Amino acid sequence: MDVILLERVAKLGQMGEVVSVKEGYARNFLLPQKKALRANEMNLAAFENQKAQLEATNLETRKEAEAMGEKLAGQQFVIIRSASDSGALYGSVTIRDAAEAATAEGFTVDRKQVALIAPIKDLGIHTVMVILHPEVEVEIELNVARSPEEAELQASGKSIQDLAAEEEAQAEFEIAELFDDIGAAGMDDDDDDAPAPAQADPSSEESSEED
């Protein structure tokens, strides 16, 4: 199907271009989202009449998106999820979760603007693209952790593997200290059980002096 693009569409074309697309793509996405019109004589004439207005509207919305993008770009949002010791989530983080996390921090982000190839299924910091306008894209970070404390550690640059290694090392240190304490206590008990040194009999000493 031939359509007239009413705005820039990634990997397809710029505003005003007539492009050929699959009918399903046009019917299910481009036309209902008002990103394109059927390329017929009437619509071509209508587009030419509205072209100046469409370009002005596009410029205004792009400026708004750029202003928001300057604030949103590089922001990190924390999402708390349950996960195994290996870092695998019990569930996943979706585009809806990403949009809600950003919105909760005061940014107006619709889930349709979040470009996530597949749901996130592991702890860690994940980079996600947000498309604010056909010509404005920014990256944000999702800090997926099991607790706010873990999120802070991840934000400082530590991975889930680093955290697990530190916890294991701490556990081994505590066990070693426990055995040291037990060993020290055993030595004290041995000292208490040792027989007292024999004391000289005063009477025998007196007898020796008389002789």
Curated annotation (Swiss-Prot):
GO term, biological process aspect, one: translation
Biological function: Binds to the 23S rRNA.
Protein's organism: Jannaschia sp. (strain CCS1)
Matching Pfam families: Ribosomal_L9_C, Ribosomal_L9_N
Gene Ontology MF terms: rRNA binding; structural constituent of ribosome
Any one GO CC term of the record: ribosome
Gene3D superfamilies: Ribosomal protein L9, C-terminal domain, Ribosomal protein L9, N-terminal domain
Keyword terms of this UniProt record: Ribonucleoprotein, Ribosomal protein, RNA-binding, rRNA-binding
Protein family membership: Belongs to the bacterial ribosomal protein bL9 family.
Region described as Disordered: 180-211
Protein name per UniProt: Large ribosomal subunit protein bL9
PANTHER family (alphabetical): 50S RIBOSOMAL PROTEIN L9
